[in-house]
Each structure stands twice: as structure tokens, then as C-alpha cells.
Amino acid sequence: MGSLMLLFVETTRNSSACIFPVILNELSSTVETITHFPEVTDGECVFPFHYKNGTYYDCIKSKARHKWCSLNKTYEGYWKFCSAEDFANCVFPFWYRRLIYWECTDDGEAFGKKWCSLTKNFNKDRIWKYCE
């Protein structure tokens, strides 16, 4: 028996709900629904936020040309493109290995570039970014 793929996009004035792809192949089907509202330009990024199966501590570039963030702790369709002020800040002090750091460090970085943790406990969370 062959496969049938459907693409359904419904757009309203305030949002668009995309359902894609719907593949009907014998007895199985897959449906993914994502709701995106128009960008909220004056909103504030919420970190960390949950999107699909991940938790994000900084702006992401998932299915977009530019980095964006969620305006809710769990993504509910409200978002905005990130500006320089929106990116996650370093958390000080943070714990790395057996030391507490009060500023960016190059410890453990192969190329000597300074970095910081985005949570208080790098050993547990392993979330970081390079320092500017």
C-alpha cells in the first residue's frame, strides 16, 4: 500500500497553526502541530524555556533565520527575535569542578577563550556561553 502525505496550514488574523507532515502509511500516522503567533516586539525573554523536547537557557535559532526566545516558561506560541539585550547573562558566582568563579574563566577551555556558566552549578547543568 502507498503513502499519502498531507500538508495543512490554517492562518487567522492573530496566529497560524501549521500541521505538517501528516503521513498515512498503512496503520500509522504522524501529526505535529505548532502554533506561532506574530512576534511580540516589546516582550521579555524567559530563561530557561521549554520548546519541543528541549530546555533552553539562551536565544535559539530553531527553524528561523535569526535567534529568538520564548516569552513563556513553556513555549505557547509567544516569541520575539532576540536583540543584544535579550541574550542570557552569565551567572556569578558559579561552581566549576571544585572551584567557585566570580568572573569569566578560561579554565577547561582548549583554545583559552573565556566562558561562563548560565546556571549556578556548571558541574550539574553543563550550560555555558563564551564571554564577550
UniProtKB/Swiss-Prot annotation:
SUPFAM superfamilies: Kringle-like. Pfam families: fn2. Expressed only in the epididymis. It comes from the Eukaryota. It is found in: Secreted. Disulfide bonds join 45-69, 59-82, 90-116, 104-131. GO terms for cellular component: cell surface; extracellular region. Residues 1-17 form the signal peptide. CDD domains: FN2. Glycans are attached at residue 53. One of its GO terms (biological process) is sperm capacitation. Residues 40-84, 85-132 form the Fibronectin type-II domain. Keywords: Disulfide bond, Fertilization, Glycoprotein, Repeat, Secreted, Signal. One of its GO terms (molecular function) is heparin binding. Binds sperm in vitro and promotes sperm capacitation. Specifically promotes capacitation induced by high density lipoproteins (HDLs). Also binds heparin, phospholipid liposomes, and weakly to gelatin. Does not bind chondroitin sulfate B. Belongs to the seminal plasma protein family. PANTHER family: BINDER OF SPERM PROTEIN HOMOLOG 1, SEMINAL PLASMA PROTEIN. This is Binder of sperm protein homolog 1. It comes from Homo sapiens.
